[in-house]
């Protein structure tokens, strides 16, 4: 302690010295608390990061649902080409949402429900409208397709780890969308394809979980190629790409697409 401070304190009454010491300690404590307490900006940034982590996958599911609803509107207004492309975009979003949820440790009951609602909208209702026409039998086929997707989503839990029972509806939808584009909306071809897809979806066959973004590198390359095809490629080559991708899952489910590989 300096000589000046010592002389100053020596001239003060003992009570004043105690008050001064307590006041200084109080100021120091307040400064420490200010340093240790996070600012409102820090709290807001932390909350934003946590909100983003928990809802990134949900945002993808909602985007898938938006694609489905937009596809429905396009079909009702006669824009079949746009409707098919929106279904294919939904296909990519659906493959991504589960992977993002697991990667960020953000799986939840809400996310599972959103995923099912989005799948039913895009791969059930929107895809069925690709079959819609003024013919009564086509309308019945539309309803049968929607019901098969509903049954597939609600009742076909296999109980076997890493396995689905019945063809996942995203693949049947991708095939129908590609066939519609490649055939120019030929109803005879679409009817035959839809009936085959319905049978695959309600069958008792087992298909592996298709965790494309959580498996081998070549599967991630396939997914990246799908994104490039949708954004940059002309429709014939993109349709052939998605058609081969989806058909390979039906023909070689375990040998090619098992998430354990």
Regions found by a protein language model. Give the residues of each.
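Helix-coil boundary and interhelical linker segments in multi-pass alpha-helical membrane proteins
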Residues: 70-85, 121-143, 178-192, 234-240
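C-terminal ends of transmembrane helices
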Residues: 97-107, 148-163, 202-210, 253-261
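C-terminal membrane-associated helical module and adjoining short loops/tails
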Residues: 1-45, 164-261
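Membrane-embedded alpha-helical segments that form the functional core of polytopic membrane enzymes
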Residues: 54-113, 127, 140-146
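Internal catalytic or translocation cores that form aromatic/hydrophobic pockets or channels
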Residues: 103-165
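Lipid-exposed faces of alpha-helical membrane segments in multi-pass integral membrane proteins
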Residues: 56, 60-66, 86-89, 121-124, ...
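Short, amphipathic, aromatic/basic-enriched membrane-interface segments that mark the entry/exit
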Residues: 50-59, 108-115, 159-166, 209-218
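Hydrophobic positions within alpha-helical membrane elements
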Residues: 69, 99-102, 120, 124, ...
């Amino acid at each position: 302690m300096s000589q000046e401070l010592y002389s100053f304190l020596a001239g003060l009454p003992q009570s004043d010295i105690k008050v001064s010491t307590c006041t200084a300690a109080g100021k120091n404590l307040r400064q420490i608390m200010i340093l240790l307490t996070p600012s409102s900006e820090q709290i807001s940034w932390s909350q934003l990061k946590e909100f983003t982590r928990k809802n990134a996958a949900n945002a993808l599911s909602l985007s898938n649902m938006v694609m489905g609803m937009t596809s429905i509107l396009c079909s009702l207004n006669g824009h079949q080409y746009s409707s098919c492309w929106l279904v294919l975009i939904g296909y990519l979003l659906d493959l991504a949402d589960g992977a993002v949820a697991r990667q960020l440790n953000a799986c939840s009951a809400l996310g599972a429900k959103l995923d099912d609602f989005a799948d039913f909208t895009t791969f059930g209702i929107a895809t069925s409208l690709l079959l819609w026409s003024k013919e009564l039998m086509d309308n019945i086929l539309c309803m049968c397709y929607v019901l098969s997707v509903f049954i597939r989503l609600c009742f076909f839990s296999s109980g076997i780890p890493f396995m689905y029972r019945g063809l996942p509806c995203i693949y049947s939808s991708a095939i129908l969308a590609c066939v519609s584009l490649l055939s120019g909306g030929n109803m005879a071809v679409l009817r035959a394809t839809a009936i085959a897809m319905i049978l695959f979806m309600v069958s008792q066959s087992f298909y592996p979980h298709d965790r494309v973004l959580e498996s081998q590198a070549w599967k991630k390359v396939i997914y990246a190629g799908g994104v490039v095809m949708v954004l940059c490629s002309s429709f014939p080559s993109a349709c052939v790409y998605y058609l081969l991708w989806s058909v390979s899952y039906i023909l070689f489910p375990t040998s090619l697409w098992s998430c354990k590989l």
